[in-house]
Amino acid sequence: MEGKRRYDTGQFFNFARNSYLERTSRPVYAIVFLLPFIIFYEVGTILINTDVLNQSQVRVVAFVWLQHLLEYLGGGSRLAWVAPPLVVVIILIGLQVASGKQWHFSPEDFLPMAIECTLLAVPLIVLSLFLNSPAEPQGDIGRFADSAARIRNEVVPRCFLVEANSLSLAAVELGHRMAAGKSLLADIVTGLGAGIYEELVFRLILICLLMLFFQDVLRLTRRNSLILSVLISAALFSAHHHVVFVEGHFGRTAAFNWTEFGFRTIAGVYFAILFAIRGFAITAGTHAFYDIIATILNAAFFQY
């Protein structure tokens, strides 16, 4: 029993001790593997926005939620800006300590992890192309300009929402862009941020809280608790791209569409299953790599 407890990997599954799958499911791997993503997001956000600390920038919604929570708990606005990355690291350190797993990590595993994340992003790319055929483009899946604006032809929906006129799933524009044109760098930066902070909120935190509620409060079976937690977290993940709660107010970020909602829900289920099997590092990495691939595909082939 002790061995099983100490080497229980991912969120709900076991792998052979010290195998690649077991090692890369450890929280310490998530810290080291995702640290460059976090740094790139923080630095990139500053570079692509003016007046960073005065709220005139594009940010990932989940990042904003963490900021506001920290401000509510007594942190200043400047501290709230730098604190969310520390929250990610602290949570993962806590999980690493609680898991009782080895702290050792092998740098040789990081390239295979990046390749794995890229390959795991492919099914979502294929699904998005299937649902948004270029023959009959459905336009933006994540955001709209004003009601009179024409939807552009972008085929591959990204997992973030950054400006008023492009495909995305998870970040929202707060303020105005520095330029009217779309920034490829900005979309890559926000995609990386969405991969980390949305997976933190909707998978690592929300699924665990839902599991506790269904198992410990409602006394449901583990199987039923897991199914309900995955479905609810996926639905909320999808819904928050249509209606978000920011700065004490609800706001609509995109008109509701069943195809859009369905794709995001499927993506949420996919990420939840991936989280249950492979842990936070691979899930967040897959989310981020999907956003990057989708951004590049849209920019290279589908925008005009």
Residue ranges and their predicted role:
Residues 18-34, 68-79, 101-123, 222:
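Interfacial transmembrane-helix boundary/kink motif in multi-pass membrane proteins
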Residues 34-55, 128-133:
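Alpha-helical transmembrane segments of multi-pass membrane proteins
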Residues 53-73, 174-179:
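Perimembrane loop-to-helix junctions flanking transmembrane segments
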Residues 98-194, 211-220:
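Juxtamembrane helix-loop-helix connectors linking adjacent transmembrane helices
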